[in-house]
């Protein structure tokens, strides 16, 4: 059986509705939210989205639940805040 949604991917379910640019944006978001991410605790590629902003590691012996972004585990704001906190800690230690 051939792949019928080569160009549109997961947004093939919308057909011709809603416009191409909106479907392109939705495709990017849906691919991010349905993919697996690396667990920061066990290092395995087993973190999946359970609800908006809630991520769970299904690794053997890990089963940690994380709070993150709605579509990805980490957001740009969280990464920025984490690096700022790390930099401030280094300044205090020195």
Curated annotation (Swiss-Prot):
It is found in: Cytoplasm. GO terms for molecular function: structural constituent of ribosome; zinc ion binding. The keyword Cytoplasm applies. Pfam families: Ribosomal_L37ae. GO terms for biological process: cytoplasmic translation. One of its GO terms (cellular component) is cytosolic large ribosomal subunit. Its main location: cytoplasm. InterPro entries: Ribosomal_eL37/eL43, Ribosomal_eL43, Ribosomal_protein_eL43, Ribosomal_zn-bd. Keywords: Cytoplasm, Metal-binding, Ribonucleoprotein, Ribosomal protein, Zinc, Zinc-finger. NCBIfam families: eL43_euk_arch, PRK03976.1. There are 2 genes for eL43 in S.pombe. Component of the ribosome, a large ribonucleoprotein complex responsible for the synthesis of proteins in the cell. The small ribosomal subunit (SSU) binds messenger RNAs (mRNAs) and translates the encoded message by selecting cognate aminoacyl-transfer RNA (tRNA) molecules. The large subunit (LSU) contains the ribosomal catalytic site termed the peptidyl transferase center (PTC), which catalyzes the formation of peptide bonds, thereby polymerizing the amino acids delivered by tRNAs into a polypeptide chain. This is Large ribosomal subunit protein eL43B. It comes from Schizosaccharomyces pombe (strain 972 / ATCC 24843). The gene is rpl4302.
């Amino acid at each position: 059986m051939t792949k019928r949604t080569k160009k549109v991917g997961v947004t093939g379910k919308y057909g011709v509705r809603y416009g191409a640019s909106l479907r392109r944006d939705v495709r990017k978001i849906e691919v991010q939210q349905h993919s697996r991410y690396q667990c920061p605790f066990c290092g395995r590629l087993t973190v999946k989205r359970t609800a908006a902003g809630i991520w769970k590691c299904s690794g053997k012996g890990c089963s940690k639940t994380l709070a993150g972004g709605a579509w990805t585990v980490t957001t740009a704001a969280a990464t920025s805040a984490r690096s700022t906190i790390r930099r401030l800690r280094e300044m205090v230690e020195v």
